[in-house]
């Protein structure tokens, strides 16, 4: 895409997003009363749907920032996770450093590194998007680029600069274990929290770990994240110390339970699952690449396991690959091409689905599935008091106990996870029934079986898309 088109896109952003209602019009983000979800101050639910533009502060110019964030808005994302700095100093696309040669924050000049970050945050706000601010990437802390006193100085700077922006979510860590110089993160987190009373905070851990392993008692941490990572089943890669059982690498649903084994319970989500179009196993493309169906599977498995939301990622977008940059992780396309890949544009159906039903009563409940399998054959079930959702990755038969929710009769639909299309299956008695999404030989289509107490009107028989709800609770789907 050329510069003129980017400039036009940037202008259109201002025209189309300035007057729209923003999520924070509902108040600040906070943890729900049951400690398992995120919500606004006025009680409305917040379903986290994140994207991973990690290198946006360094690799995108202003017009590209506006174009990218508008595409995120249109695709339903409400959180953009970035590295604030990926070096000391870090340099942006204009060649401007974040720090001077002595390692001091550099805020002078006509358009500083931090002015560009301001622009990113403000443009995200215009699009109704929170910015997940990984304050300093973990490798820098591990490498000794920040000590306790520097963390306090940096935290004071960040908190004072951004405490009044409405769309900030703080991240400690950055792909690093929590026992690597934890005193630096404690200093950084506590400094920010002592100044900024407006925003929630979490920690981004190393792959196959949950932040709860190190930070379950940390007062500064409001919710947990885990990184299920980019490996396939039975891809241990010779690791001697392995935090998960063998041959469970893709079972990201299990991290919800392992996180909640730590007390107190806090909301949790997968902040880095396998990315669309990244090599299976990350470093070697001989096994192929993760595709849209895989990123959908990770999203539904995690959320139906109890997560308060989900983060999606794309190999090309996370590094903003284009001509002139060396491609990391065998990247095959540019970031602008990736914005039109299927997985990027299909995550919104999960968000719309979860916001179509009573939000805070939802629990994971595998007891509704009477013939469950393992790995790809595993059906993931979640329910409220009067609705039941079952994600089926392989379109296999499902023996389901409809008695687990209220109602003498149940209305049932099938939702295509790739399109959000709803198919009315009928009304059924309150008993154990076997459902098959498709006729024999019709092929594979991952999706969700939806069963609702027939006395409820969360969905309509005539509704053909999950993102056009009819009736049901007064739920704002714009966040």
Predicted regions and their residues:
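Bacterial Sec-dependent N-terminal signal peptides
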Residues: 1-21
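Aromatic- and carboxylate-lined catalytic core of secreted/periplasmic carbohydrate-active enzymes
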Residues: 44, 264-268, 275-278, 291-426, ...
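Short, solvent-exposed loop/turn segments at secondary-structure junctions
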Residues: 53-54, 87, 138, 177, ...
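Short hydrophobic alpha-helix segments
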Residues: 49, 426-428
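Short beta-strand segments
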Residues: 171-173, 202-205, 225, 269-272, ...
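Catalytic-core region of carbohydrate-active enzymes that cleave or remodel glycosidic bonds
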Residues: 218-321
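Active-site mouth of glycoside hydrolases
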Residues: 22-235, 246, 250-251
């Amino acid at each position: 895409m050329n510069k003129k088109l980017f400039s036009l896109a940037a202008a259109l952003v201002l025209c189309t997003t300035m007057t729209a209602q923003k999520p924070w019009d509902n108040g600040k983000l906070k943890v729900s009363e049951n400690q398992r979800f995120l919500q606004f101050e006025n009680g409305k639910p917040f379903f986290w749907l994140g994207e991973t533009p990690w290198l946006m502060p360094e690799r995108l110019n202003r017009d590209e920032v506006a174009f990218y964030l508008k595409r995120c808005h249109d695709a339903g994302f409400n959180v953009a996770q970035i590295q604030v700095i990926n070096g000391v100093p870090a340099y942006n696309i204009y060649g401007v450093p974040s720090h001077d040669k002595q390692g001091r924050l550099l805020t002078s000049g006509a358009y500083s590194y931090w002015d560009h970050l301001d622009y990113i945050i403000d443009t995200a706000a215009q699009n109704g998007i929170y910015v997940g601010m990984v304050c300093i990437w973990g490798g820098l802390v591990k490498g000794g680029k920040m000590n306790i006193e520097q963390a306090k100085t940096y935290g004071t700077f960040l908190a004072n600069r951004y405490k009044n922006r409405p769309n900030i979510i703080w991240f400690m860590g950055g792909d690093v274990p929590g026992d690597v110089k934890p005193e630096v993160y404690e200093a950084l987190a506590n400094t920010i929290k002592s100044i900024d009373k407006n925003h929630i905070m979490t920690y981004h851990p190393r792959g196959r770990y949950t932040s709860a392993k190190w930070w379950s008692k940390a007062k500064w941490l409001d919710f947990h994240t885990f990184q299920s990572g980019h490996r396939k089943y039975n891809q241990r890669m010779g690791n001697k110390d392995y935090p998960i059982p063998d041959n469970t690498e893709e079972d990201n649903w299990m991290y919800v339970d392992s996180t909640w084994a730590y007390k107190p319970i806090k909301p949790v989500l997968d902040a880095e699952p396998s990315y669309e179009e990244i090599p299976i196993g990350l470093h070697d493309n001989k096994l192929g690449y993760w595709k849209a169906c895989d990123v959908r599977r990770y999203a539904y498995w995690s959320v139906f396991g109890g997560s308060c939301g989900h983060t999606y990622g794309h190999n090309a977008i996370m590094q903003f690959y284009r001509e002139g940059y060396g491609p990391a992780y065998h990247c095959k396309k540019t970031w602008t091409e990736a914005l039109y890949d299927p997985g990027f544009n299909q995550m919104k159906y999960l968000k719309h689905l979860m916001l179509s039903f009573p939000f805070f009563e939802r629990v994971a409940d595998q007891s509704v599935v009477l013939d469950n399998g393992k790995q790809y054959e595993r059906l993931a079930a979640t329910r409220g008091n009067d609705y039941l959702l079952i994600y089926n990755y392989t379109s296999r038969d499902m023996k389901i106990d409809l008695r687990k929710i209220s109602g003498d009769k149940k209305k049932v639909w099938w939702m295509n996870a790739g399109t959000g299309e709803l198919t009315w299956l009928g009304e059924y008695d309150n008993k154990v029934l076997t459902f098959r999404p498709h006729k024999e030989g019709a092929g594979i289509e991952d999706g969700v079986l939806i069963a609702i107490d027939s006395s409820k009107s969360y969905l309509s028989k005539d509704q053909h898309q999950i993102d056009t709800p009819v009736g049901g609770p007064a739920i704002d789907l714009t966040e």
